[in-house]
């Protein structure tokens, strides 16, 4: 049986696509997982796969700071090389981020094929620097292909969890009624700014009959301040596939993972890119959906600014009784999201890995 090392760490945007690929390979590979101590993978991975952790970080800074980081990278790469040899690893798969650097270098050192998946429209620094050392590079969005020097990436899309690909019921805790369903995903990064934008426009929408599920993320101090029978606030939910499949409209950050989930569910979206994202990659991700007509981009703004409220009213107006609005807008956006979606990304990546180790 093929022995595969998956290197994915840190955020759901790196972990969930890797888990989807692992599911697609189920029964065909013996999977070991390379991660970093005290990150999300320590919660999600050990129940399913053997997790091995190394200390890995970025290469920011100058002088002594960068020297220390380079030494740490070398040490991590040596550890990965030893791991590959000890466990007789046949191939390495990584979804980028800090852990990708020692994984790719260790694989190169051992002559083992490495596959790198880049989900963002603007590739990360590790992808740009080390993509040329991989046996294959896959991208989630077409525009990324020309931004990775020294290699010829293949477009696969970004894998999503299986629940997003199968029809799901609307959770029974969602507010009932005939009004449109608005789902807000604050996200794990920078949720407070987006959440405050949304809360400023919710009272009017709720009074007009809109039903709202607001997933705030874990760092929002204002949870519970707004109360209404058609509003449910929660920090996280395991029912996101069902929520997105039944939502009339979603408001979300524009991380590549969230964008892929919205696309496969065909959910019309207002995307609010995280303004501090590296290289403004969320702006570029959002543009990919907007160019196909699947999303509207609203940049983060103070709560009193009218941009978000105006966009919601324009898109949901027909459902809220505005006779001057265009009811076909949401269906056109669903078609745009459907065009963006790549529903077999996990299977494509599984085939790519299988072909490399034959």
UniProtKB/Swiss-Prot annotation:
- Name this polypeptide is given: UDP-N-acetylglucosamine--N-acetylmuramyl-(pentapeptide) pyrophosphoryl-undecaprenol N-acetylglucosamine transferase
Q: Does the keyword Isomerase apply?
A: no
User: Is Cell division set as a keyword in this record?
Assistant: yes
Q: Which domain of life is it from?
A: Bacteria
Q: Which family does it belong to?
A: Belongs to the glycosyltransferase 28 family. MurG subfamily.
The gene behind this protein is murG
Of the GO CC terms on this record, one is: plasma membrane
What function does this protein fulfil?
Answer: Cell wall formation. Catalyzes the transfer of a GlcNAc subunit on undecaprenyl-pyrophosphoryl-MurNAc-pentapeptide (lipid intermediate I) to form undecaprenyl-pyrophosphoryl-MurNAc-(pentapeptide)GlcNAc (lipid intermediate II).
State which Enzyme Commission number(s) the record gives: 2.4.1.227
| InterPro entries, A to Z | GlcNAc_MurG, Glyco_trans_28_C, GlycoTrans_28_N
Look up and give the organism this protein is from: Synechococcus sp. (strain CC9902)
What are the annotated disulfide bridges? none
What Pfam families does this protein's entry cite?
Glyco_tran_28_C (PF04101), Glyco_transf_28 (PF03033)
Location (main, coarse): membrane
């Amino acid at each position: 049986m093929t022995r595969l090392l998956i290197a994915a760490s840190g955020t759901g945007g790196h972990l969930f696509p890797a888990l989807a690929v692992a599911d697609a390979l189920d029964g065909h590979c013996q999977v070991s997982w390379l991660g970093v101590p005290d990150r999300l993978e320590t919660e999600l991975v050990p129940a399913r796969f053997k997790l091995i952790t190394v200390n890995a970080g970025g290469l920011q800074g100058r002088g002594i700071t960068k020297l220390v980081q380079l030494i740490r990278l070398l040490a991590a790469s040596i550890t990965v090389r030893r791991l590959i040899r000890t466990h007789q690893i046949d191939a390495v798969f990584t979804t980028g981020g800090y852990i990708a650097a020692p994984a790719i270098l260790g694989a190169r050192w051992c002559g083992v094929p490495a596959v790198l998946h880049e989900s963002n429209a603007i590739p990360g620094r590790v992808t740009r620097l080390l993509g040329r050392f991989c046996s294959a590079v896959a991208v989630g969005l077409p525009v990324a292909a020309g931004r990775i020097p020294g290699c010829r990436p293949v477009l696969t899309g970004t894998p999503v969890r299986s629940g997003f690909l199968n029809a799901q019921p609307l959770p029974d805790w969602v507010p009932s009624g005939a009004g449109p369903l608005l789902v807000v995903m604050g996200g794990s990064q920078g949720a407070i700014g987006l959440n405050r934008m949304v809360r400023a426009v919710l009272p009017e929408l709720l009074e007009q009959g809109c039903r709202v599920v607001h997933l705030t993320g874990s760092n929002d101090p204002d949870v519970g301040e707004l109360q209404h029978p058609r509003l449910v606030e929660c920090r996280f939910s395991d029912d996101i596939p069902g929520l997105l499949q039944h939502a009339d409209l979603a408001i979300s950050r524009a991380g590549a993972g969230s964008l892929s989930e919205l696309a496969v569910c065909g959910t019309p979206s207002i995307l609010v890119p995280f303004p501090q994202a590296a290289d403004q990659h969320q702006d570029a991700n959002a543009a990919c959906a907007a160019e196909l007509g699947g999303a509207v981009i609203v940049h983060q703004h103070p709560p009193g600014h009218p941009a978000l409220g105006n966009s919601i009213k324009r898109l949901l107006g027909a459902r809220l009784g505005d006779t001057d609005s265009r009811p076909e807008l949401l269906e056109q956006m669903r078609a745009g999201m459907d065009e963006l979606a790549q529903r077999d990304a996990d299977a494509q990546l599984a085939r790519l890995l299988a072909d490399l180790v034959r």
